[in-house]
A protein has these predicted regions:
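Conserved, well-structured interaction surfaces
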Residues: 40-49, 53-59, 83-159, 175-190, ...
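Short coil/turn linking the two alpha-helices of tandem helical-hairpin repeats
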Residues: 156-163, 207, 228-237, 447
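Membrane-proximal, proline-rich intrinsically disordered regions
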Residues: 20-69, 339-342, 351, 356-358, ...
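Bacterial Sec-dependent N-terminal signal peptides
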Residues: 1-29
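Long, intrinsically disordered, low-complexity segments
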Residues: 113-116, 191, 274-337, 422, ...
Length: 575
């Protein structure tokens, strides 16, 4: 995909994309392209590139839809930054108080995702006009259906009740009559599935350009959508899970079948998924990733700006780092393992994890930077309980996320300063570990507990061997790493809880946790317990409360509601 981003300026005149407007302003128009001149494979390809480019087209945190700023609502992460007023809209989200329909961040994500859909639909419309002699037509249409499904999926996870724009020939007048309640919850998921099935039936097993989705990517995406759909929310006046659908779970099993992923597998070390160097990009575990580049002739390269607020403020290195999205103490405690090498489940948060005494899952040290250990495994940047590692003087603790950050030694090469800090590290959307965990969850819910536990143990076996960066930690820093596999038999309820915990540990700080809690119907119970336990050590939660049947989803933005001419209905919860 990196190479297809370079031709983006070629389509400015076709779709109104303005990144190259200075170039256009320097020339006198010489005429208008006829319909037949526009309907060429070259122009269709350029429109497809424009749709992909939405993921790298802006120097700000929402540019690639990473979702970390909405995951601060979970028990995995604090907002971070320099106090509660720094990024106050994120603080409102993390305590679930004072969230307004006019918050800029809520509207901004809505607008960006529908802009993505607009570009995709423009590409689909033009592709449909090209002749059958365009050999890539069907494949490009499948790619666009995949991207449209992705945008609708993100919107539905965030706002629940959304207008689906699946008619690429929709007129402006028709668009203004769309309703966000045309489809009920299950029907909305099915709209996304329909696009994905078209993609799945056409996409190839491999792509020359790495950023384009493959058949396996469509399969992984279908599994995820069916898993969300399985947890039915049938009551229009509630966001509660009313039932778990067996048929949808069986679809998850179908689309996570190992035969669909012959080209994929687990990395030997989980950390390989979160390294920017070329030899680690698009590895065996990466099924579909947003591609970023450097040194491509543009000012900064097509960099990942979505993590721009996350790096800490290290003097002489990451100066100006904003220190957002900080791992919570609760998450750190969750990695604590017992004498049997297994998670502590109901008791992990009864005491603060002590690295000098307590056993821990090795993934802790690959997910969370902690005082007493080197930041990003670089001994030149030892972490301490100082302002370097907390702009808020400890209000949000001194932990730092490792999965989004890059070793400061790579500044100027893979880590670059613009308005924020950005890197060329790809953002993996679907990785093979997620596929295994989705399959395990479906098996557990269907009562096939042995198969579920076997899949969890695959993940844990890989975790035990993920020590290439931290092998010296026990002898050098005194940490105690111990993880073991599950043995014996477990009933359905036990297996489900095992899968949920494993998903939290494996996918920690990848912006999935809050959405998982909502999907399971666990959000109110888990988060209100979390708030109550955090108050004594984290004052930001003194007024925090999760209101069931409201806070599971964002409100429909005020500006969108106002412009809908009465066709949109606000989400439940008295916004």
């Amino acid at each position: 995909m990196k190479k297809i981003l370079y031709i983006i300026c070629a389509i400015s005149a076709i779709c109104g994309f303005t990144a190259c407007n200075s170039f256009l302003d320097e020339h006198t128009p010489q005429g208008v392209l006829s319909d037949e001149q526009v309907k060429t494979p070259e122009n269709a390809e350029a429109m497809v590139v424009s749709a992909y480019a939405i993921f790298t087209s802006a120097e700000d945190i929402n540019s690639s839809f990473s979702m970390w700023n909405f995951d601060v609502r979970s028990d995995d992460a604090y907002k971070g930054g320099n106090g509660t007023s720094d990024g106050d809209v994120f603080h409102q989200l993390e305590i679930q108080q004072g969230v307004l329909t006019t918050n800029w961040n809520i509207n901004d994500m809505w607008v960006r995702l529908y802009n993505c859909i607009s570009r995709v639909n423009s590409a689909i419309a033009l592709l449909n006009t090209t002749g059958d002699d365009f050999k890539m037509k069907s494949q490009r249409l499948a790619e666009m259906k995949f991207l449209r499904a992705y945008a609708h999926f993100l919107l539905k996870r965030l706002y629940k009740n959304i207008p689906f724009v699946v008619n690429e020939n929709l007129t402006y007048e028709e668009y203004n009559t769309l309703s966000n309640t045309e489809y009920n919850n299950d029907e909305g998921w099915q709209v996304i599935i329909d696009d994905l099935m078209e993609a799945y039936n056409t996409l190839p097993a491999t792509q020359q350009d790495k950023g384009r989705p493959t058949k396996a990517a469509a399969a992984a995406f279908l599994a995820k959508v069916y898993l969300y759909k399985a947890y039915r929310q049938d009551d229009e006046k509630s966001n509660q899970v009313t039932s778990i659908n067996k048929g949808d779970l069986e679809k998850v099993i179908e689309f996570t079948n190992p035969t669909l992923y012959a080209n994929y597998g687990l990395e030997n070390d989980i950390h390989n998924n979160f390294r920017p160097e070329e030899q680690y990009e698009n590895g065996i575990e990466s099924i579909w990733a947003i591609q970023y580049s450097r040194n491509d002739g543009s000012t900064y390269g097509n960099l990942n700006w979505s993590y721009g607020l996350i790096p800490p403020n290290i003097p002489g290195a990451t100066d100006g780092g904003c220190d957002f999205y900080k791992p919570s103490q609760n998450l750190v405690n969750a990695f604590h393992t017992g004498d049997n090498g297994l998670p502590l489940f109901n008791t992990f948060n009864q005491k603060k994890y002590d690295m000098a005494v307590d056993n821990a899952d090795p993934r802790l040290f690959l997910t969370v930077g902690m005082p007493g250990l080197p930041y990003m495994f670089n001994k030149n940047f030892m972490m301490e309980e100082t302002s370097i590692w907390s702009r808020s003087n400890g209000l949000y603790g001194y932990h730092v996320s490792l999965k989004q950050n890059v070793d400061p030694a790579l500044i100027g090469e893979y880590l670059i300063k613009g308005s924020y800090w950005a890197s060329s590290m790809n953002r993996i959307v679907f990785r093979y570990a997620d596929v295994l965990l989705m399959r395990a969850e479906a098996y557990a819910q269907l009562g096939n507990t042995d198969q579920a536990i076997a899949l969890v143990n695959q993940i844990r076996t890989r975790a035990a061997g993920s020590t290439q960066m931290i092998a010296s930690y026990p002898s050098t820093y005194g940490v105690k790493m111990y993880i073991a596999n599950y043995k014996g038999s477990y009933n359905k309820d036990e297996a489900v809880e095992i899968v949920k915990m494993e998903r939290r540990l494996e996918m920690a700080m990848e912006s999935e946790r809050f959405f998982d809690l909502v999907r399971w119907g666990d959000a109110a119970t888990v988060l209100n317990k979390y708030f109550a336990e955090e108050i004594s050590s984290c004052a930001i939660y003194s007024n925090a409360h999760f209101t069931a049947n409201k806070d599971e989803y964002l409100p429909i933005p005020f500006s969108q509601l106002s412009a809908s001419n009465g066709h949109y209905t606000q989400n439940i919860g008295n916004w």
